[in-house]
Amino acid sequence: MNLEQYTKINNFFIRHSTAFSLLLTANRLLTACGFLLYPLLLLCLLTKKNIAMLISFIAIPALCFLAGTIFRKVVNKKRPYEKLPIQSLIKKDKKGQSFPSRHVFSIFLIATLWFCFWKPVGIFLFIAGVFLAIVRVIGGVHFVTDVCAGALLGVLAGLIS
């Protein structure tokens, strides 16, 4: 997105406080949704005594998350509020490390794992992931390329698991 688009979006949310509150709430709830469902998946695998899948669903995502974190530090891509003269709607003091989006990576990874285990929950999380990606871009903390890369890498990491 460019400066004009971000300005229009920011102005809309500044004028409509209810929409602004919904945006911030959506960011928190969608993020929490993925992170709460991941331990539940691991618990399900444990109760089904599927230890091989449990180990795989812990070890590979952890390694991918670590590799992604290191990659973000090396690339150190600026965030929209650093590159453009805008105020992000989602408050974030962090500089750089925008690419790929770790929030979107995580929810798409968890969605893929759930999809392999129980498709309805996976589908729900994929939909939540799309909304989270939109919220992160509208909120001014990521560019579209950041969230698209996060989604793609999350799915790939999930498939490897």
Q: Could you say what each language-model-derived stretch is?
A:
Residues P39-A67:
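Interfacial segments of alpha-helical transmembrane regions
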Residues M1-L37, A52, G68-G96:
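N-terminal transmembrane-helix/juxtamembrane module of multi-pass inner/ER membrane proteins
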Residues C33-L45, F115, K119-F126:
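Hydrophobic alpha-helical transmembrane segments
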Residues T18-A19, K49-M53, P80-Y81, W118-I123, ...:
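Membrane-helix interface segments
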Residues P85-S161:
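Membrane-embedded catalytic cores of phosphoryl/pyrophosphoryl-handling enzymes
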Residues L43, G68-N76, F115, G158-S161:
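Membrane-water interface at transmembrane helix exits
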Residues A59-R72, I123-V135:
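Small-polar-interrupted transmembrane alpha-helices in polytopic inner-membrane proteins
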